[in-house]
Design a protein with these regions (language model features):
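Mid-domain catalytic core of redox enzymes
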Residues: 34, 237-326
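Conserved Rossmann-like nucleotide-cofactor binding loop
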Residues: 23, 46, 273
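Helical element adjacent to the flavin cofactor pocket in flavoenzyme catalytic cores
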Residues: 193-255
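Mobile amphipathic helical/loop "lid" adjacent to a hydrophobic cofactor/ligand pocket
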Residues: 74-78, 82-191, 204
Length: 326
């Protein structure tokens, strides 16, 4: 960064962002694009939170800290990638399809949304869930009209749990999107996801994978961008406390000292428990579901980078990349 650029950055209004997971990283990048000066604090030694890659000596391979399947309708993600110059870091899957296997029966099928907003694929048995009725799919439109701020009803309030669609589509969808069983999943949040993906057609539903790993595809470009503008994240900077002046934050106390805030905004991109610890009176979720990822190394590499949804299995998804199955 040139001295002129450094001076210009220092004159910008500041915004202080707590947590350098993907939310915090994206907030810092967007703040820069809006003409603000982002100050990003992270307690650990890396950005990205749980969205990252690491070298596993037992496999002698770099693996992702959890399997992530990204869809074309995630406009926030692709805007972020464009802002950091990493538009080509993800691999689009072609054709647009979601392969499934019912482990108990051996039945296989591909969910294949059609191009455009007219969902003619629902009329083609070979492109939809076996045993599904057209009326089952009407629930998608009903859910997409729900307001997340007006209803907290579970997904099952809108579904026929005895229909084949429940086990073969709705339950896997709830687990994949919200990491929650359909009985507890927010109907409105699932509806919003459907409205931004499947109900918009094939391009918005297109799966994307990260061939080089999550860190290289999503995290490193953001960190590099912030470093290039002279505002790299502050790592190993755990927030010990927030200092309040009434309802405004006037200081951020870290392990290395206190950062005074004369003006500017503070954004919390922290996990719920940490945010609750720092912000008096904040109500936050206190129930969570763990995700277990198991990685295997194959004797022979599979050159395809692909995935498979499993029904009636202890494992829900299988991803292959090179000679590693996750």
């Amino acid at each position: 960064m040139t001295e002129i650029g450094k001076t210009a950055m220092e004159t910008r209004p500041s915004v202080y962002i707590l947590g350098a997971g993907m939310a915090g990283l994206a907030a810092a990048v967007r703040a820069d694009k809006l003409g603000l000066r982002p100050h990003l604090f992270e307690a650990t030694s890396h950005a990205g939170g749980r969205c990252r890659s690491f070298f596993e000596p037992g496999l002698d391979r770099t693996i992702d800290n959890g399997a992530h399947l990204l869809l074309g309708g995630n406009t926030g993600l692709f805007t972020y990638l464009s802002e950091v110059g990493a538009q080509d870091s993800l691999k689009p899957m072609d054709p647009v399809q979601f392969p499934f296997l019912d482990v108990a029966s051996g039945l296989r099928w591909n969910l294949q949304p059609s191009a455009g907003r007219l969902p003619w694929w629902l009329l083609v048995p070979g492109r939809r869930v076996p045993g599904g009725r057209l009326s089952d799919y009407l629930a998608m439109a009903r859910l997409a009209r729900l307001d997340p701020n007006a209803t907290d009803s579970p997904l099952t309030d809108f579904l026929d749990r005895s229909a084949p669609m429940f086990a073969r589509f709705w339950q896997p969808l709830a687990r994949a999107v919200l990491n929650t069983e359909a009985e507890d999943a927010s109907a409105a949040l699932i509806g919003r996801m459907l409205g931004e993906t499947f109900l918009k057609g094939a391009e918005a539903s297109r799966p994307y994978l990260a061939p080089a790993g999550l860190s290289q595809a999503l995290v490193d470009p953001g960190v590099t961008h912030l470093a290039a503008i002279g505002q790299p994240p502050s790592f190993a900077a755990r927030i010990k406390a927030l200092i309040f002046d009434g309802t405004c934050v006037s200081g951020i106390e870290t392990d290395s000292g206190t950062v005074a805030i004369a003006d500017g905004a503070v954004i919390s991109a922290l996990p719920p428990g940490e945010a609750q610890r720092l912000i008096p009176g904040l109500e936050a979720p206190d129930q969570f579901n763990a995700i277990v990822n198991v990685h295997y190394r194959l004797e022979q590499a599979d050159n395809a980078h692909r995935f498979l949804g499993l029904i009636g299995s202890a494992a829900h998804w299988v991803f292959t990349k090179g000679d590693v199955v996750s």
